[in-house]
A protein has these predicted regions:
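Intrinsically disordered, low-complexity non-transmembrane regions of multi-pass membrane transporters
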Residues: 1, 118-137, 240-259
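Hydrophobic transmembrane alpha-helices
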Residues: 1-71
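C-terminal transmembrane helix-loop-helix hairpin of multi-pass membrane proteins
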Residues: 6-9, 171-259
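Hydrophobic, membrane-inserted alpha-helices
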Residues: 11-15, 32-38, 56-60, 78-82, ...
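Alpha-helical transmembrane segments and their membrane-interface exit regions
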Residues: 36-39, 57-64, 102-110, 215-218, ...
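Transmembrane helix interruption/hinge and helix-loop junction motifs
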Residues: 42-49, 88-93, 202-204, 217-224
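Hydrophobic, small-residue-rich transmembrane alpha-helices and their short perimembrane loops
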Residues: 54-123
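Helix-loop-helix junctions within the multi-pass membrane cores of secondary transporters/permeases
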Residues: 95-189, 193
Length: 259
């Protein structure tokens, strides 16, 4: 599949908007489960976009940024990985193995960009001391423009100039290597879940985890059915723990002379 200039620009604009949302809006538009289908719509393959976005969401679900420890960049990883899956026709698991190296490289660039921007803070301090609100606004808008432009270029350049070579590269690579990428991509969602469980797991959650494992591994229930049952359990637990409304105490009556 060939990607037109218009499609590459549209994907770059999508990365621009998602990059600003990740650090400023936080409407969760930057998550793979949202970006994947949007990439699929732009490239005309919504089905693959949904599958790849869902697979990548499992990978990044447990990768939360903690201070200076930043996970691979979720936006470029999703856009490049989903585009790779659509243009080459590989399975989403293989696309995960391709997306993560791009995501790691871009996150290093983001860290460098933020380090450069930190040099402007001393100037912002002087503006704040002089009550120069317009100057601070200009600095903020400039930073947003620089961040969005970086995301645009990181999405546009590899997609527009590299998409036509991606299919050729896949055809040349040995089948064992492709299978290895698929295995690595299949392991990464499990790693994401493991990291998420390490963060939120408590002893009281272990029985629910066992129930979900039995339902999925032994009873072969679909994920949607397990999610609906988990939602019902969560609602039951919430309603049981919610305090009942207390009745107002009846006013005490005072009696005089024994009446």
């Amino acid at each position: 599949m060939e990607i037109s200039l218009f499609q590459a620009i549209a994907l770059g604009i999508l990365a621009f908007i998602a990059g600003l949302d990740m650090f400023n809006g936080l409407t969760h538009m930057h998550r793979p489960v949202v970006l994947g289908p949007l990439v699929g719509l732009i490239l005309g393959d919504l089905h693959t976009g949904i599958l790849t976005g869902g697979t990548l969401e499992l990978v990044w679900m447990g990768l939360a940024p903690l201070a200076g420890a930043q996970p691979p960049n979720v936006i470029i990883g999703t856009i490049v990985g989903t585009t790779f899956a659509i243009t080459t026709g590989v399975k989403p698991d293989v696309a995960v193995g391709v997306a993560v190296p791009f995501a790691v490289a871009v996150q290093m660039g983001i860290t460098f960009l933020f380090s450069v921007m930190s040099g402007v803070m001393s100037r912002c301090d002087r503006m704040a001391a002089n009550a120069d609100t317009r100057g601070i606004e200009r600095v903020n808008y400039l930073a947003l423009l620089a961040l969005g432009t970086f995301y645009f270029l990181c999405a546009f350049l590899p997609i527009y100039f590299g998409a036509e070579h991606a299919k050729t590269a896949i055809d040349v690579l040995p089948e064992r290597l492709i299978d290895g990428l698929g295995v690595a991509g299949g392991i990464m969602p499990a790693i994401g879940f493991a990291v998420l469980l390490k963060i939120m797991m408590k002893n009281v959650y272990i029985p629910y985890f066992i129930i979900g494992f039995v339902a999925g591994a032994w009873l072969k229930l679909p994920v949607l059915a397990i999610a609906a049952a988990a939602l019902a359990m969560a609602l039951i637990d919430l309603l049981r723990k919610s305090p009942e409304p207390t009745q107002p105490a009846a006013p005490k009556e005072e009696f005089e002379d024994g009446i």
